């Protein structure tokens, strides 16, 4: 305790003092005294215990131990051994624990290696087996499945539309040997069980000779004969239809809608028995014939005289039966009296023969007529789908593959020759004046004046006299009238004509039919009226059936109306000159399209009722005249139409209501078409449309001539098919059913044309949907017989993802052309191959169990054809072809190909050239000699000794024909929410355009904008699939951007449409499986999947990539990319946290925290600055600046050519640039100089590969993608290896090698550290020689130092490195410059640097025996003329490099390789001490070599270095405001 008197005295002293300093000093003294007395008290209490403990530990215990040891006796040899082995033991402990830290970085476990390759095996085998469960798809299981598969050709069908179409469907079984007559009366037939053989009638000119038939050896390929004889008429096999495919062709489906559109009704009361017998034989013969065909047909061998009512339908059926087309056109132009002749109706051109018992399902033709009336828009959509498939399957295959463009364009030739809608001279002059003298001001004034006149016409409609301001054009001098002429339809003031064709009948309006229906009191009254004597009401209906365009019908009118202008056009008396010729142009185009007032209106229920009457009458006639137990026309049930039944209470039915256009009127349609019409002047020689280019619209020639040209791709010669003269049209097929032109349109003279843009045509045809019916009707009548035959035999094949097209070893019975989608070609090992590769040891057996039994050969994309080789050589399929995604194909049967080859020998020549080109392109190595002689040095090389590149995943995404990457669609999919998908995708799309690929990016918004009003209805899928197929033809690459939630249908669409799927991930987030990835796995897609890891800076933490890839065995490749969203560049992307509105407070808190940390760091540096030396202080400052006070948070590359987006775009588009660095020991230091020259010339590098020292330098450059750190690490490594003392300390007993390899391992590990190859910024690989399994190993994953060390393990100097039981040595023994592996990975341009030793080709001649003493004397004799004989070690080295020498020569001659060879022959393999000298040699050579290439124009084109082609996608961002 402190004495109280002392305290009192101190207080008194303080109170007496007033000085502040004295008070402070006194307080300090008090505190010191207090501490002293407290410490003395503690010392007195604890001092004895502390002293006793100290004496025991430091005095008694050591003294007792020393006394014991000193007293003990130790032999001298133990002291010597201890002094010798103690430092050794300490060194070994330090070496194993400290200096050998690299040894803890073991290679990947064998299980991990197996799992890495397991997904590729599962993908391939699952696709081969037809499903991920390993079970092969065994086809369909029921009739219903077969039927549903066949009606996919109709596209999407609504439920009620489907029921309406199929409620009259019947099934029929055919026994073996029965024949089915395929004409329009059958309907839509589908094979649901068994198979049918389609036969085509042989022309009489060909029937007399056997030259038109296939050779006997060709027909022996099949078990059945290829010809058939019925009633003395020969038929030739055209196709074999299997279960699930339709028997009807695309044209025959269109005819089901178009033929007998307004049916003929015969009055039964007035029809005589003679007239009732005048029914064509086609309606009396059953569609099915048994073996007694001739006997049954003989009973019907009678002369039939068809009446006028059946003339037009029979003519239409004749066209559908592929008869003589030109004869059909001319007969249709003849009067009815001449067309009616006593002829015996022959069998149809197409018949179906049941090779075995089979079953078919038939939808009768009446169902299509009923569908046309009840659901006209749905029927129109079906017609659009069929027209599109007709264009894509038949026309496009005939044009691009078979070269039958002339036959396709024959349609337009017939159309222009059969009709003529030439404008009058004065209207032509008006159009020419408008084009020549027209201006914008006059156009505006004219439009204003016309609008004023139209407004006045409304008031002047009832006035007796016309307005004086209006202009009148009198048309008086006309010799003849044609459809589309101004006298018939153009509303001008003109004089009516009383002359008309005798065959013309005025057609009543639909309103009159409706009025008749309303006037009927009951359905019975309607029935009586139909059966009554007053049949004149229906005479117009019988004459209003669709007629051929070539018939040139006269003007609709008659003597009942003297002035047609006062009756038909009373609402438009006032018009201008421009509106007149516009209307005339539109009517002329309508005439070619077959559009009339009746055809533009949807059918009504009256026509349906009449159709039912006509069909029922014909069916009764058919049954009564000829009955057959297998006739499908027999009605099993007799039903009445619901319209004929009247009940007191009728339950309301749910009807499928279709959207019908408002104010559908013929005049309104003409006005809307006229508004979109344009007039153009085209100078002579100008090309309007290029061949295979996008069509722009429909052209009507007003004045001048237009050439239709076709260029043969084989001889590159352009042919003129025909000339379009004034009054004709051009672009008919491309405008109406397609969007690409098969021919070129070129102006022969100065052209004045009326132009209807395709956008206007599509918009108005969608509004007036019944136009498609007339288009289909006109088209089916104009097609040539050859195209019709081709259409019947070609098949449209639709495959879903992972569905097998054909299997390996199946008979080759067809050639396939890919319309859209993607397929993968797989090859399964045979039993002999499996027996040869069977393992012998237990370890190898476990490893081989997971080796792929299926190999990916390649892939087929849009436009590719395959199967020609097997068909021409009559061999089985050599591989299996499976669909990667939804795919459409055109199938050309072998029988059709043989028929076409006989009729058109040019097709056989064309296909043979195509096959030869594919074979040469696929196996380019075969055409090169295996043994060559270099013309430069005269040395011989054998390429048979080279090692082929590893299979791996190089074939995934590569085209099977050309070997290059051919992705048509790419999907960008995030792994989780919160990633900037759209911003990243837009930048990638812009980059694709920069590298020369026409690319379009699709988001949900852009797709919905295209779908328009169909965005959310059930037609969206149909419209969407057609839209995607069209985009794949218009653009080289389509990018699908999954910018919607995971449950959105757009996300699933993006996954199903991608040839390659890019998974977007934030590298700094948690590497767990995201919700989008789960959706990807559930969809079980087999498309190539690549992972994109986004980093804010160009640095990858060691082992980070392995964490991402370990759980994702479905990822085939990965890429590291530097990307920071521009929306918030100062923060990383947080994938888990959703966007929070209150972000600014968090930002302010982080800024305050960072400021406090900066102040603390600054004070710490100031406190230690006085105590630390300058070296340590500099180190601390560097660390502080690097990790704490980083001025620039994100690293931005200085060189623009190192853009990561450009690198990704080049890789995905097959334009990657590779760098291959060869081995050569210390000579490889020159690689640094080459890299410096490459960077200075702005050449980017996308992939790096190397061998030996090339793998070391290339790995360091791929790790950082920067030359500065690479230079420093290589120089440090060269210093360690060049140290003599380090090498001497690493020597060992030379049993396997002279050194232990420890110093070498440590030097490599010092350079790479713990990083893995997956963590490299650039894709990288190195090779090594596996002396255990005698093969080349390609290393693309694992710890970098191990496999770089394996690639640098020179035999004798370093021991082989072990990897999963295999001993690996230097890769230079097999391939010192692995260029072929780089080429197999899809690189187009490869820079190869060779620094190996020169191959010694000195000729030797020392006799048949050799004395070793003479060899020694010869080496020391300076006057000897004999070269030095190699030693045993040199011979062994040459033997080891035999394969490498030949591989090097092959790499030099590989296409796309730029070969570097620095002058480093004067330097040895171990001259690492000459680092700077060798580096300068490489720098000088690289700069000079690249400069010479650039000057001579031999430097390859670098995609991405040029400015972008076309405008990029500009994003709208929010401004950076607080």
Curated annotation (Swiss-Prot):
The entry's a nucleoside 3',5'-cyclic phosphate 2-binding residues are 778-918
Sequence motif GXSXG, residues: 1250-1254
Extent of Low complexity compositional bias: 498-511, 540-555
Give the principal location in a single coarse category. endoplasmic reticulum
Where the record annotates domain PNPLA, the positions are 1219-1383
Q: Name one Pfam family in it.
A: Patatin
The UniProt entry annotates the motif DGA/G at: 1370-1372
Give a yes or no for keyword Lipid metabolism in this entry. yes
- Any inhibitors or activators noted? Inhibited by organophosphorus esters.
Keywords attached to this entry: Endoplasmic reticulum, Hydrolase, Lipid degradation, Lipid metabolism, Membrane, Repeat, Transmembrane, Transmembrane helix
Give one GO biological process term: regulation of phospholipid biosynthetic process
Task: Indicate where this protein resides in the cell.
Answer: Endoplasmic reticulum membrane
| A GO MF label | lysophospholipase activity
What stretches pass through the bilayer?
74-94
Task: Report the top EC class in one word.
Answer: hydrolase
Q: How does it sit in the membrane?
A: Single-pass type I membrane protein
Q: Where is this region: Disordered?
A: 443-468, 485-523, 535-556, 828-852, 1125-1145
Q: Show which residues sit on the Lumenal side of the membrane.
A: 1-73
- May I have one GO cellular component term? endoplasmic reticulum membrane
What does the record give as the active site? 1252 (nucleophile), 1370 (proton acceptor)
**What PANTHER family does the record point to?**
NEUROPATHY TARGET ESTERASE SWS, NEUROPATHY TARGET ESTERASE/SWISS CHEESE D.MELANOGASTER
According to its UniProt entry, the function of this protein is described as: Intracellular phospholipase B that catalyzes the double deacylation of phosphatidylcholine (PC) to glycerophosphocholine (GroPCho). Plays an important role in membrane lipid homeostasis. Responsible for the rapid PC turnover in response to inositol, elevated temperatures, or when choline is present in the growth medium.
Protein name as it appears in the record: Lysophospholipase NTE1
